[in-house]
Amino acid sequence: MRISKASNIESTGVSNCKNFNSKNCSKYSLMEVQNKNEKKRSLTSFHAKNITLIFGIIYVALLGVYICASQYKQAADYSFRESRVLAEGKSTSKKNAKTALRKTKQTTLTSADPEGQIMKAWAADPEYRKHLNVLYQILNNTDPNDELETSADPEGQIMKAYAADPEYRKHLNVLYQILNNTDPNDEVESSADPEGQIMKAYAADPEYRKHVNVLYQILNNTDPNDELETSADPEGQIMKAYAADPEYRKHVNVLYQILNHTDSSEVETSADPEGQIMKAYAADPEYRKHVNVLYQILNHTDSSEVETSADPEGQIMKAYAADPEYRKHVNVLYQILNNTDPNDELETSADPEGQIMKAYAADPEYRKHVNVLYQILNNTDPNDELETSADPEGQIMKAYAADPEYRKHVNVLYQILNNTDPNDESS
């Protein structure tokens, strides 16, 4: 009995041990499988996350490229549309400018006005502004070096009443507005309008209207035959009526005689401007009438005595009648324009004859340069085909820059215009 029990106990223990070992073994093997599965799952999850991340990066990159390409395309389309609109705008503006140029009227300031000739270089070139300012100073009779000039200089026209009389300054400003073709009250047709200076005799005299209209065409660079010529071309102002009208040719020839100081009558000396008052002058009341009209305009006197607000008569100030100095200088200008000098035999400093030097008769070069001025005034250029016909600067030939002689003669003309002569005392 004891032995059997012992053997039973032993066998039971062994079986229990075996059962315990088998359980542990299965448990450990299950854990290993679970660990392996977890590792596989984590590795798979890691790879899946990496793949998802890579695809996300690729998607973001492609999306960025697409957005950039879309924006670039929009910018390119906008730039193309903008350039096309600008080109169409420039083309339209050019067409409108040409159309407005051809429809220019006296009462409007269109692109045919000389203001259109003030190029971009105006704002960029202080030298050009300086010289224009000098001209403005001359027109306004102001000279910073007035004490250094002679009494025959236009600076002598700066009267005491000038500084004290705002009315005179106002009227000089009107002249400046007229010369610059700018009128702040243009639509109102006020006294600043040059049309106001066309007196009653203008409407009654078709001959005078014709000649004034020619001058107006020249000053405004407009041509009724505009379609045949370029609208900006001063040459277009030499109209068909010029060649067909001997009356107008005669008057222009008189001006040419005055500028060149030559007399076809050969009665006077060729250097004497008095010789330019030809026999036809005294015999032709028509020409005398037109010169008298110019004198009336320059002296601001009108035989009609209407004294309209637009009339230059408004410029006759109280100081004018009271100041003999101003009257004297205006009379000097009248003498110069009419080429008559009461002191001719004395050869005074106010006499233009004193400015015609001895070299004038002996120097054919001077005559050549005066002819250049005549070409400029008549808007004709012998070298027109070589230069741009619309460009007045094209009349300043290459010889200008290379020829100091020409500069000297131009200075002589400047002296004449300013009524100062470096050889005045020796005349």
Swiss-Prot record:
Keywords recorded for this protein, A-Z: Malaria, Repeat
The keyword Repeat belongs to this UniProt entry's keyword annotation: yes
Record InterPro entries: Glycophorin-bd (IPR003681)
Pfam families reported in the protein's UniProt record: GBP_repeat
Positions of GBP repeats: 109-149, 150-189, 190-229, 230-269, 270-307, 308-347, 348-387, 388-427
Superkingdom, taxonomy of origin: Eukaryota
PROSITE patterns: GBP
Residue runs in coiled coils: none
UniProt KW Protein transport keyword: no
Miscellaneous comment: P.falciparum undergoes three cycles of development in its vertebrate host: the hepatic cycle; the asexual blood cycle, which includes the extracellular merozoite and the intraerythrocytic schizont; and the sexual gametocyte cycle.
Annotated protein name in UniProt: Glycophorin-binding protein-related antigen
Annotated organism of origin: Plasmodium falciparum (isolate FCBR / Columbia)
Lineage: Eukaryota, Sar, Alveolata, Apicomplexa, Aconoidasida
